[in-house]
Amino acid sequence: MAEPSPSEELASQVNGVYYLTGIRWKNNEPSLRVQIDGAPSTVLVEARGLNLRFRTDVEKPGRCLGRIERSVEGSSYVECLSPSTRGRRCERCQVIENVSAANMHQAHRKGRDSIDQRMAEYLSHPHRLYVAIFRDGSTKVGTTRGSDGGQRLVEQGAWFAKYVAHVEDGFLVRELEDVVSKSINLGQAVDTRKKFAGHLRGQRNSELETTLKDLTFEVEKVLQTQERDGWVSLDE
């Protein structure tokens, strides 16, 4: 007899307590990362077509969302079974996340020798520079690790996007990102609440595509002024 799938198992335990700790994207398909109260590890549940009906158990403490570790191999999720004490994470995971984020986003200013070795190895890998637009018309410039872009744009929730440069590593790509941001006043982040709200009052696709095309043209003009080695233009 076949074992029940994770979603069937969750559905059968209607009185159980579950912690939704994140979403994992693989091959452009989303899965929910779920912890079952008392279980030793995380279960991945396919999200496409999943119907969720739940009650919030106010008597139970929140659960830490875990953290992301980065190394030469890429990014990996580290689960944590501790209660959340600082926002959505436990104190230890939050401190590690804060240090990791500071090292990653300030690496090009701090220098390779001034950040954690594992982060330096993570960044010593080809990256891409992209321009993205979201459903409400919000725009940003961003970076993603890997020669093919990976799952980053899907994770970000971009409605449309263009890759504008292939860069030799994560240090140089962030220098280019900063140049673009300062030159045309283009932000590097969009609030998650705006991303969600945009699906309720989204702009027409034709409007978004036109805005992105015009913005990409401006970004490309900025990049053409950068006479340095280590990157090439993209139009993808």
PLM regions and their residue ranges:
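Non-catalytic accessory segments flanking enzymatic or RNA/DNA-binding domains
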Residues: 1-236
